[in-house]
Curated annotation (Swiss-Prot):
The record marks G333, P334 as: Cleavage. One of its GO terms (molecular function) is RNA binding. Pfam families: Rota_NSP3. Keywords: Host cytoplasm, RNA-binding, Translation regulation. Belongs to the rotavirus NSP3 family. This is Non-structural protein 3. May play a role in stimulating the translation of viral mRNAs. One of its GO terms (biological process) is regulation of translation. It is found in: Host cytoplasm. One of its GO terms (cellular component) is host cell cytoplasm. The keyword Thylakoid does not apply. Residues 334-402 form the DRBM domain. SUPFAM superfamilies: dsRNA-binding domain-like, NSP3 homodimer.
């Protein structure tokens, strides 16, 4: 005889249910061939391809509890003669309870797997360890209907200053289902620079990573020691790997080093690189308005073409602005988003910012940013989230007289 507590058993059977067919699991629980066919026909076929199975789950829980009560009251049990089975009433109820528990274990443990399989497929690249994730039509339809949201998991160790990188990843995912080439507009910038004549590897890596992240990265602690110390192996390849190890949000898909098998093809298309000059110096170079520039130990200057590449960034990254410090003629001034953030921080204000995505007639994607700060409201549109946000920020600051 079952008790109310037996409902909790549904999660303990998950191991056997996950490793065998539902048919075998039912038979192992004491069910007959006919009963197994009945269960699969009545229940399994109805929910196996369903994405939202919460209704089935709740129905099973309710039914299991009802059966538990019936098992403690033979008169109630005898009235349930419509249930199809070839065993005595009590055994029949025990079997249905077992069957419901198996279903619940499948619903609880297998749901995530079934949902993912219904929306995505993974294609393994031949001869490579990387995978291509394909979004199925089912997922695209759900996104269009607003029933599916894709978010980037945010590691707790990511600092507030790295939000731009997260937004970048979200931008890629937003456009992913449209099957379009992704272009990320970046601001070329330095990270923390040390001018001791021996830190070019750190300086060049800081510039490349800061540009990709969208914020100057701190490279040294208060004692002046490198935060991403690689000892005597001061090579940008080692430094960037150390950054990844310490959970700076730079990913393998963001760059290739000169030991990668596809390095040459990446190098041809890349707009942002670290190059070695005379085998003794490293600089960060980037393409801006069809000209190549470089950060050489923090100093901005035209690149003369010397050197060979060590690290190249993904071609999706394109430089649309240069941020440099000091009284330099090319200095475009503080970025509008930095100015806005400083104003918000200074006066402890709350900024409301949301985005919409629109597919244009030519197949391109347009982002619209809706921004509100105090009494000021603005709308900005652009080819990227950052561009849309900048346009809205200009309008907001203009309304506030800043």
């Amino acid at each position: 005889m079952a008790t109310q507590a037996s409902v909790e058993w549904i999660f303990n059977v998950a191991g056997s249910a996950a490793s065998s067919s539902l048919d075998k699991a039912i038979k192992d629980a004491g069910g007959s061939e006919n009963f197994s066919k009945y269960v699969i026909t009545k229940f399994y076929d109805n929910y196996k391809d369903c994405i939202d199975d919460s209704g089935v789950y709740n129905a099973c829980i309710g039914r299991a509890k009802t059966i538990d009560k019936a098992l403690n009251d033979p008169k109630v049990a005898e009235r349930n003669e419509e249930w199809y089975t070839n065993v005595a009433t009590i055994s029949r109820l025990d079997l249905e309870l077992a069957e419901l528990k198996l279903m619940l274990s499948n619903l609880g443990i297998k749901r995530e797997e079934r949902v993912l399989n219904s929306m995505f497929s993974v294609v393994r690249e031949k001869g490579r360890s990387s995978n291509v994730i394909m979004m199925k039509q089912n997922a695209v339809k759900m996104i269009e209907e607003g029933k599916l949201k894709i978010k980037v998991e945010r590691n707790e160790t990511y600092t507030e200053s790295l939000k731009n990188k997260i937004e970048e990843l979200e931008c890629i995912i937003d456009a992913f289902e449209k099957g379009k080439d992704i272009t990320i507009d970046l601001d070329a910038m330095n990270g923390e620079v040390k001018l001791d004549g021996n830190s070019c590897s750190y300086n060049s890596t800081a510039a490349l990573v800061s540009t990709i992240l969208g914020t100057p990265i701190k490279m040294y602690n208060e004692s002046g020691q490198p935060l991403f110390d690689v000892g005597n192996y001061m090579n940008p390849k080692n430094i960037i790997e150390k950054m990844i190890e310490l959970e700076i949000p730079i990913f393998k898909s963001d760059y290739r080093n000169n030991e990668s098998p596809d390095f040459d093809s990446w190098n041809e298309r890349s707009n942002l690189k670290i190059v070695s000059v005379n085998d003794c110096h490293a600089i960060c170079i980037f393409k801006f308005e069809n000209n190549w520039w470089c950060f050489d130990d923090g100093r901005l200057k035209k690149h003369n073409g010397a050197g060979y590449p060590l690290i190249v960034a993904n071609s999706k990254f394109q430089i649309d602005k240069i941020l440099i410090s000091g009284d330099i003629e090319l200095n475009p001034g503080p970025d509008i988003l930095v100015t806005l953030n400083d104003y918000i921080t200074k006066y402890q204000l709350k900024l409301e910012c949301t985005f919409d995505i629109f597919l244009e007639d030519d197949g391109s994607i347009t982002y619209t940013c809706y921004m509100k700060l105090e009494s000021a409201e603005a709308i900005g549109s652009g080819r990227s989230k950052k561009e849309a946000k900048r346009i809205a920020a200009y309008d907001i600051l203009d309304q506030l007289g800043i």
